[in-house]
């Protein structure tokens, strides 16, 4: 589990593509790799990946074909920076919201506005089906960053980026057309899906509950 608070950036220094797997080498800070162990989970642009090897400030991860197909990691090239977060430990502060690192869909940056030192970023979902899980002031995780939904229109939503987020993550450098990873709030998904199932199976009982 993660919190959506990016702890540092990593530079992809090597990508080795094989038949059904891609091996990455990511260089980051001493602080971020301190006490990092083999087999540990690490969030790379919001994707939960497993550390396969560590050499000084470089760690290695394997990315399977399904992850490459269903996330924006297939757009990353050598030299590009990604958002990193170590897995949370019990007792630590949860500054964002709980996220699993399991990407539900991707989105495309459809509009970007500079607001003094802030930014307004609009993202269109690649699969409009998932827009039902988006609510005003709800949580969303974009490329591993915990953000608050500012507005929703059709199959798109907007987030407002403060200077700290722009400075410490890659999202401030996004341009129109860039693909980003999206993880919806787990609890919102459970609530929406549960209500939908109840309406489908017992619509009259649900309506009676509302009347009461």
Swiss-Prot record:
Which residues of the sequence carry a binding annotation for 2,4-dihydroxypteridine 1?
4-6, 146-148, 160-165
Binding positions (2,4-dihydroxypteridine 2): 48-50, 62-67, 101-103, 137
Q: Which residues form a coiled coil?
A: none
Annotated GO CC locations? cytosol
Superkingdom per UniProt: Bacteria
Q: Whereabouts are the Lumazine-binding repeats?
A: 1-97, 98-195
Enzyme Commission code(s) on record: 2.5.1.9
From the UniProt record, report the name of the gene that encodes this protein.
ribE
Extract one GO molecular function annotation from the record: riboflavin synthase activity
Q: Which GO terms describe its biological process?
A: riboflavin biosynthetic process
Whether Transferase counts among this entry's keywords is: yes
The record's section on CDD domains has: Riboflavin_synthase_like
Keyword Repeat in record: yes
What quaternary arrangement does the UniProt entry report?
Answer: Homotrimer.
- Please name the pathway: Cofactor biosynthesis; riboflavin biosynthesis; riboflavin from 2-hydroxy-3-oxobutyl phosphate and 5-amino-6-(D-ribitylamino)uracil: step 2/2
Matching entries from SUPFAM superfamilies are given as: Riboflavin synthase domain-like
**What protein does this entry describe?**
Riboflavin synthase
Keywords of the record: Repeat, Riboflavin biosynthesis, Transferase
- What biological function has been recorded for the protein in this entry? Catalyzes the dismutation of two molecules of 6,7-dimethyl-8-ribityllumazine, resulting in the formation of riboflavin and 5-amino-6-(D-ribitylamino)uracil.
Record field: catalytic activity: 2 6,7-dimethyl-8-(1-D-ribityl)lumazine + H(+) = 5-amino-6-(D-ribitylamino)uracil + riboflavin
Cysteine pairs forming cystine bridges in this chain are: none
